[in-house]
């Protein structure tokens, strides 16, 4: 893969997550009954960071959990037929709560659909919202994010790589040309 450009650096990612945190608070008229569920791998640390920003703004904690989807990742170029849920971990009930799924890249929406199914199989939330750092287009399902860090129209030959300090040792979002 050939690097085309860096779309977001560490400061831009932080600003973006702070903005998304404010949008979540505003849209939900506070943080009562909100639960953040990160879609592993990189959605989980993003959900934790958003929870920290919300706590700093509102002075109250937000519960955070994760759902682990396997066999398909929107941020990879190889697509399997159907994603499956490997595990879901949340230490609070989601019944009658506002669940906000958090992911790094929204692409075809198949991973998000699997995460929604996992949440609904777990319990009956009041509603499900979606926050993503990057929306790159090419949706195959009628799903849209409620909170978007940055819209990056891409070709199918391009790859968006989100790197997070917790996993990769740095914070950045880069776009690459896929060399076939």
Swiss-Prot record:
It comes from Clostridium botulinum (strain Eklund 17B / Type B). A motif (PRPP-binding) lies at residues 99-111. Homodimer and homohexamer; in equilibrium. One of its GO terms (molecular function) is RNA binding. Regulates transcriptional attenuation of the pyrimidine nucleotide (pyr) operon by binding in a uridine-dependent manner to specific sites on pyr mRNA. This disrupts an antiterminator hairpin in the RNA and favors formation of a downstream transcription terminator, leading to a reduced expression of downstream genes. Also displays a weak uracil phosphoribosyltransferase activity which is not physiologically significant. Belongs to the purine/pyrimidine phosphoribosyltransferase family. PyrR subfamily. Keywords: Glycosyltransferase, RNA-binding, Transcription, Transcription regulation, Transcription termination, Transferase. The lineage of its organism: Bacteria, Bacillati, Bacillota, Clostridia, Eubacteriales. NCBIfam families: PRK05205.1-4 (NF003548), PRK05205.1-5 (NF003549). It catalyses: UMP + diphosphate = 5-phospho-alpha-D-ribose 1-diphosphate + uracil. Coiled coil: none annotated. It is an enzyme of class 2 (transferase). It comes from the Bacteria. Pfam families: Pribosyltran. Its EC number is 2.4.2.9. This is Bifunctional protein PyrR. One of its GO terms (biological process) is DNA-templated transcription termination.
């Amino acid at each position: 893969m050939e690097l085309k450009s860096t779309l977001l650096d560490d400061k831009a990612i932080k600003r973006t997550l702070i903005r998304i945190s404010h949008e979540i608070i505003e849209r939900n008229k506070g943080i009562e009954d909100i639960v953040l569920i990160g879609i592993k791998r990189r959605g989980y640390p993003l959900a934790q960071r958003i929870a920290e920003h919300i706590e700093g703004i509102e002075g109250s904690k937000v519960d955070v959990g994760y759902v682990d989807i396997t066999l398909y990742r929107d941020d990879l170029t190889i697509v399997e037929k159907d994603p499956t849920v490997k595990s879901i971990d949340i230490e609070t009930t989601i019944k009658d709560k506002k669940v906000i799924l958090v992911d790094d890249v929204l692409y075809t929406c198949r991973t998000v659909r699997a995460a929604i199914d996992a949440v609904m199989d777990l319990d009956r939330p009041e509603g499900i919202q979606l926050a993503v750092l990057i929306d790159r287009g090419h949706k195959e399902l009628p799903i849209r994010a409620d909170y978007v860090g940055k819209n990056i129209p891409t070709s199918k030959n391009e790859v968006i790589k989100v790197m997070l300090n917790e996993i990769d040792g740095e914070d950045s979002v880069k776009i690459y040309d896929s060399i076939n």
